[in-house]
């Protein structure tokens, strides 16, 4: 490391020791986790009955009525560029008319996209013609260029949260960011206020603030709430150093070190700064129009009701342990709660003396808690719910990505491929202890659960270090409970054509416009 390197490291708020440790991790890799089983209904996954659904909804509404602070936390830094990979490919293709199935589907259904009118305006502005005429002349690439490039809507560079997703009428077309504001009013508001926090990239912060300034009052009036909307950026101190294939630091063409964002696991630092009793976490692109929100609202309240019910019990037990007024029978009751309700087991628990048992139970009860919605596996990419062995020998529930599983272990691969459920990033978190003090969330990260990915820059291969994922290793030492939620609550948008699914059509049959489906010219 030369002086320029050290200055670069210091400017990011990273220590030299951290860099050395990161390079060591890149060199040695990370251990695979030891698995006991894939979680399933009755084995780590709750499936509430209709009566239980009502009871948990009621528990959540009672909790809200007590005036607790609730925050909806939305990771929203993702750029939309990957959504349009196929359309970028069309722009650079040697042909000019839709050829692949994806391209044909896009153009045949262009009238169904919520951004259609805005795109038509840009086409008229830049080409002197609307979408219909351009397509009629075979000028399909002009339409796509106006969608993706800076001269047009610039969707190739915008964050996903600011794209037009759902069209309700000619005057109301919503972005995912707006849909999250609506959701916050419907299940995450208390005392007439809805707190929403978006994590965004630095380049997009002003755009998000501008959209909030334009829209927040409209939704506040519509739903009768006061919005408190805040933003944060991923901290430069969570960036990780890139390495060459020989594990030496990768350097840019000017000789400087290359740092890369550490992945969504870096957001544990942002989550740690949220002052709230309960925090909902959900990805920016998993939203539906109002006509399909009922299931989402119901099951968000259910998982939140389960969280506060379990937390209340854990707090009662911690206060009891503090008081000293308990007998062995009471300790056995607490063991049952930890094992059955919190799904955390220890093989040698019967061998512990009461004094050791109290230390163990206190440690397991007094930590952050999360309840995660999981949906039936339908082949979508995503983390799976597993029972895994922890560093202290206990077995508990974790959300694992494929990179954390030893693909050479046939038994583990069978668990992964035959797992009945997966996690669509649907979490509700309790981040304060039984004394009302916030937990320091970085203390509960398992640093051995990062992973190394292969990337390239300027045609040169490099190794990138990803931090433990936010809902994976970053929450490894939390109490975790899984609850089955309907598949209807999971509607991510990974490609632009996903917006053509019925689940993303705000009005069945589409919004009729003057002059037909497309814009007027």
Describe the residue ranges of each PLM region.
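Intrinsically disordered, low-structural-confidence terminal and linker regions
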Residues: 1-24
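Long insertion/accessory domains within large nucleic-acid-processing enzymes
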Residues: 407-410, 432
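Conserved catalytic alpha/beta cores of large enzymes that bind or transform nucleotide phosphates
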Residues: 133-137, 151, 155, 285-287, ...
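Polar low-complexity intrinsically disordered regions
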Residues: 1, 222, 520-521
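Short amphipathic beta-strand starts and helix->beta connectors
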Residues: 181-185, 409-412, 467
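A general secondary-structure signal for short beta-strands and their flanking turns/coil
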Residues: 193, 368, 381, 422-424, ...
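Domain-scale recognition of functional cores that engage charged ligands
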Residues: 7-9, 13, 28-31, 35-378, ...
């Amino acid at each position: 490391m030369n002086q320029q390197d050290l200055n670069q490291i210091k400017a990011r708020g990273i220590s030299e020791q951290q860099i050395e440790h990161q390079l060591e991790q890149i060199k040695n890799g990370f251990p695979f986790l030891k698995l006991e089983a894939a979680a399933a209904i009755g084995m780590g996954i709750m499936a509430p009955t209709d009566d239980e659904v009502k009871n948990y909804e009621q528990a959540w509404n009672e909790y809200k009525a007590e005036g607790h602070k609730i925050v909806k936390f939305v990771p929203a830094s993702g750029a939309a560029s990957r959504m349009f990979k196929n359309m970028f490919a069309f722009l650079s293709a040697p042909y000019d008319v839709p050829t692949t199935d994806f391209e044909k589907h896009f153009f045949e259904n262009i009238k169904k996209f919520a951004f259609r009118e805005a795109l038509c305006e840009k086409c008229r502005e830049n080409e002197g013609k609307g979408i219909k005429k351009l397509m009629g002349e075979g000028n399909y690439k002009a339409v796509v260029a106006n969608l993706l490039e800076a001269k047009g809507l610039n969707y190739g560079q915008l964050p996903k949260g600011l794209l037009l997703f759902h069209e309700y009428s000619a005057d109301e077309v919503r972005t995912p960011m707006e849909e999250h504001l609506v959701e916050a009013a419907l299940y995450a508001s208390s005392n007439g206020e809805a707190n929403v926090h978006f994590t965004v990239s630095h380049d997009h912060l002003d755009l998000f603030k501008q959209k909030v300034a334009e829209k927040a009052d409209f939704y506040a009036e519509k739903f009768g709430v006061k919005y408190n909307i805040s933003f944060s950026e991923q901290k430069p101190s969570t960036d990780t150093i890139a390495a060459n294939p020989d594990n030496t630091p990768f350097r840019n063409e000017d000789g400087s070190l290359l740092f890369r964002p550490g992945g969504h696991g870096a957001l544990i630092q942002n989550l740690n700064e949220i002052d709230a009793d309960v925090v909902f976490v959900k990805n920016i692109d998993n939203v539906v129009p109002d006509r399909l929100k009922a299931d989402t609202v119901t099951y968000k309240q259910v998982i939140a009701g389960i969280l506060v019910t379990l937390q209340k019990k854990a707090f009662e037990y911690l206060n009891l342990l503090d008081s000293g007024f308990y007998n062995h029978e009471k300790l056995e009751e607490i063991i049952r709660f930890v094992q059955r309700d919190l799904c955390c087991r220890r093989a040698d628990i019967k061998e512990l003396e009461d004094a050791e048992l109290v230390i163990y139970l206190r440690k397991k009860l007094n930590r952050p808690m999360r309840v995660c919605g999981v949906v039936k596996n339908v082949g979508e990419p995503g983390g799976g719910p597993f029972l895994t062995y922890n560093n202290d020998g206990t077995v508990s529930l974790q959300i694992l990505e494929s990179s954390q599983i030893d693909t050479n272990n046939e038994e583990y691969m069978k668990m992964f491929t035959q797992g009945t459920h997966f996690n669509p990033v649907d979490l509700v978190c309790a981040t304060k202890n039984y004394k009302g003090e916030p937990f320091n969330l970085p203390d509960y990260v398992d640093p051995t659960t990062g992973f190394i990915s292969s990337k390239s820059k300027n045609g040169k291969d490099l190794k990138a270090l990803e931090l433990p994922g936010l809902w994976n290793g970053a929450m490894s030492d939390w109490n975790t409970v899984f609850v089955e939620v309907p598949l209807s609550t999971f509607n991510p948008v990974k490609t632009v054509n996903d917006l053509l699914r019925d689940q993303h059509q705000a009005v069945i049959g589409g919004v009729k416009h003057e002059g037909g489906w497309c814009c007027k010219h």
